[in-house]
UniProtKB/Swiss-Prot annotation:
<keyword id="KW-0862">Zinc</keyword>
<dbReference type="GO" id="GO:0005737">
    <property type="term" value="C:cytoplasm"/>
</dbReference>
<keyword id="KW-0479">Metal-binding</keyword>
<dbReference type="InterPro" id="IPR041636">
    <property type="entry name" value="RNase_J_C"/>
</dbReference>
<comment type="subunit">
    <text>Homodimer, may be a subunit of the RNA degradosome.</text>
</comment>
<keyword id="KW-0255">Endonuclease</keyword>
<feature type="binding site">
    <location>
        <position position="166"/>
    </location>
    <ligand>
        <name>Zn(2+) 2</name>
    </ligand>
</feature>
<keyword id="KW-0269">Exonuclease</keyword>
<feature type="binding site">
    <location>
        <position position="81"/>
    </location>
    <ligand>
        <name>Zn(2+) 2</name>
    </ligand>
</feature>
<dbReference type="InterPro" id="IPR030854">
    <property type="entry name" value="RNase_J_bac"/>
</dbReference>
<feature type="binding site">
    <location>
        <position position="166"/>
    </location>
    <ligand>
        <name>Zn(2+) 1</name>
    </ligand>
</feature>
<dbReference type="InterPro" id="IPR055132">
    <property type="entry name" value="RNase_J_b_CASP"/>
</dbReference>
<comment type="function">
    <text>An RNase that has 5'-3' exonuclease and possibly endonuclease activity. Involved in maturation of rRNA and in some organisms also mRNA maturation and/or decay. Has an overlapping but not completely redundant role with RNase J2 in the decay of mRNA.</text>
</comment>
<dbReference type="Pfam" id="PF17770">
    <property type="entry name" value="RNase_J_C"/>
</dbReference>
<keyword id="KW-0540">Nuclease</keyword>
<dbReference type="GO" id="GO:0006397">
    <property type="term" value="P:mRNA processing"/>
</dbReference>
<dbReference type="GO" id="GO:0004521">
    <property type="term" value="F:RNA endonuclease activity"/>
</dbReference>
């Protein structure tokens, strides 16, 4: 449902993902007959979303206004900013503007979905300017944990709207530094509204420099004499480069496992972000010719993904690599929301195999790509927005970020903590909430998109917690007799061989319930099914304090 009242002179600012959550970043700026979309990300599912692969936004508002959508502009190549693009393009073929690395990553995704040939894509950099009828777009360099991050400036008739994308202020970066001079100049020119990254609003200090992490990685690798398995985000090209440099300095060759990691290395080398001597990267088949002290394995799986290379290595199901005594596994990452349990489980599995594990909680081998409070205040001080909208964070993060904005002098009434689907209406001297449109989560489960709802997830949770009970009976509605059963089958509820008394009591309860239901002259399969569920559910809860899913199956005799 859409209920928006934008006046002709107002600029609309909205999000269909990224507010009140980490992930799904998808923002929009609209003015009259033009809409510009910034990013199109996915969110990784929390533990209670059983069987769900990804969560994407509901793209209905974009699809319903497709004739007005002029561009999808990308801040950088992380999954929570580009992962939704294939799902969006299946519904709306929008021109995409992205930097070289982000574009390479997007191409890989679109090729997997068979969408690359039909896609309209343009490469941009921080000097690019895009011009449309009423709006234009320019860019400025920021710093993040992936090359080529940019902030986006959308020039509207009412003023500039700036989306920072993910950022930190790293004064000793591995890649290009952020363009503070450009940010300050924008602030002096005047900025109508800032949409800024809230992820680390709970961190009071500056985040560590990527260079510090590189030094720690080198120091750790220098002290390891066995084989090293190095797991990180495949998209963290800077981290991979620093690990590769450490391998070269310590006389190690590098083998790569995991499709996304292999692609990242290829992209990093082609674009000049990974620079090592020829022969540093080797084929997996060459590992057998090297001593353990000469090997560093880069692999996917730092988030505990069950099918990624590291999990298969740990579980002994990888075809080419198994854990060996003397190995050390380095997790150069931290778990993203929803993955903590699976990461901890994987670490436990590796350590139970007698292999050392080094991870960011214990050692200084990971740093966030998101700025803490001091960096957020610096961004606000440089940009000096009239209005402020904290984005990219859960509500408490947005709330803290809003407080930081007040600390530097932005009036409380000029700060908007919004929800996905809210539309902020702006002019040069006014701001108001102009309405709301539907922006619910859409679940991706295998090839299914949006066909999994709350009822299915509830059933999955019930099955995982309490199992299922199948109650089977054959009845004759003409004679009002039970011909066979009732029989009880169970999966994930009780061990039937050890629960004979409960099974027999359940059968007695069902026999009486079915017998009473059959006495009704209007008895039907549906009514008997209902009687089975209504009798068995409270009985089982009374006996076990568990609520399995109950599936009744009423059969009738063959008339032939």
């Amino acid at each position: 449902m859409t209920n928006i009242s934008l006046k002709p002179n107002e600029v609309g600012v909205f999000a269909i993902g990224g507010l009140g959550e980490i992930g799904k970043n998808t923002y929009g700026i609209e003015y009259q007959d033009e809409i510009i979309i910034v990013d199109a990300g996915i969110k990784f599912p929390e533990d209670d979303l059983l069987g769900i692969d990804y969560v994407i936004p509901d793209y209905s508002y974009i699809v319903d206004n497709l004739d007005r959508v002029k561009a999808l502009v990308i801040t950088h190549g992380h999954e929570d900013h580009i992962g939704g693009i294939p799902f969006l393009l299946k519904q709306a073929n929008i021109p995409i503007y992205a930097g070289p690395l982000a574009l390479a990553l997007i191409r890989g995704k679109l090729e997997e979905h068979g969408l690359w040939r039909e896609a309209t894509v343009y490469e941009i950099n921080h000097n690019t300017e895009l011009t449309f009828k009423n709006m234009s777009v320019t860019f400025f360099k920021t710093t993040h944990s992936i090359p080529e991050p940019v902030g986006i400036v959308i020039h509207t008739p009412q003023g500039k709207i700036i989306c920072t994308g993910d950022f930190k202020f790293d004064f000793t970066p591995v890649g290009d530094p952020a363009d503070l001079q450009r940010m300050a100049a924008l602030g002096e020119e005047g900025v109508l509204c800032l949409l800024s990254d809230s992820t680390n609003a709970e961190i009071p200090t500056f985040t560590n420099s990527e260079k510090v992490v590189g030094q720690s990685i080198l120091k750790i690798i220098e002290g390891i004499h066995g084989r090293i398995i190095f797991a990180s985000f495949a998209s963290n090209i800077y981290r991979l480069q620093q690990a590769a440099e450490a391998a070269v300095k310590t006389g190690r060759k590098i083998a790569v496992f995991g499709r996304s990691m292999e692609k990242a290395i290829v992209n990093g080398i082609e674009l000049g972000y990974i620079k090592v001597p020829k022969g540093t990267f080797i084929e997996p088949s060459e590992l057998k010719n090297l001593h353990a002290s000469e090997v560093l394995i880069m692999c996917t799986g730092s988030q505990g993904e069950s099918m990624a290379a590291l999990a298969r290595i740990a579980n002994g199901t990888h075809r080419q690599v198994t854990l060996q005594p003397g190995d050390t596994v380095i997790f150069s990452s931290s778990p993203i929301p929803g993955n903590t349990t699976s990461v901890n489980k994987l670490i436990n599995t590796i350590q139970e195999a007698g292999v050392d594990v080094i991870h960011g909680k214990v050692n200084n081998i990971h740093t966030s790509g998101h700025g803490g409070q001091q960096e957020q205040k610096l961004m606000l001080s440089l940009i000096k927005p009239k209005y402020f909208m904290p984005v990219h964070g859960e509500y408490r993060m947005q709330k803290i970020h809003a407080g930081l904005a007040m600390d530097i002098g932005i009036p409380k009434e000029n700060i908007f903590i919004m929800e996905n689907g809210d539309v902020l209406a702006l002019t040069s001297d006014s701001a108001r909430i102009a309405g709301h449109f539907n922006a619910q989560d859409i679940y991706v489960d295998g090839n299914g998109i949006g066909d999994i709802g709350a009822a299915v997830l509830r059933d999955r949770r019930d099955l995982s917690e309490d199992g299922v009970v199948l109650a089977v009976a054959t009845v004759d509605f003409n004679t009002q007799m039970i011909l066979a059963g009732p029989d009880i089958l169970s999966r994930g509820f009780i061990y039937m061989r050890e629960s004979g008394d409960l099974i027999r009591e359940s059968q007695r309860v069902l026999f009486n319930a079915i017998r009473i239901a059959l006495k009704n002259k209007d008895a039907s399969i549906q009514s008997v099914n209902g009687a089975i569920v209504n009798a068995l559910r409270p009985f089982l809860y009374e006996k076990t304090e568990r609520e399995p899913i109950i599936i009744p199956m009423v059969l009738t005799p063959d008339k032939h």
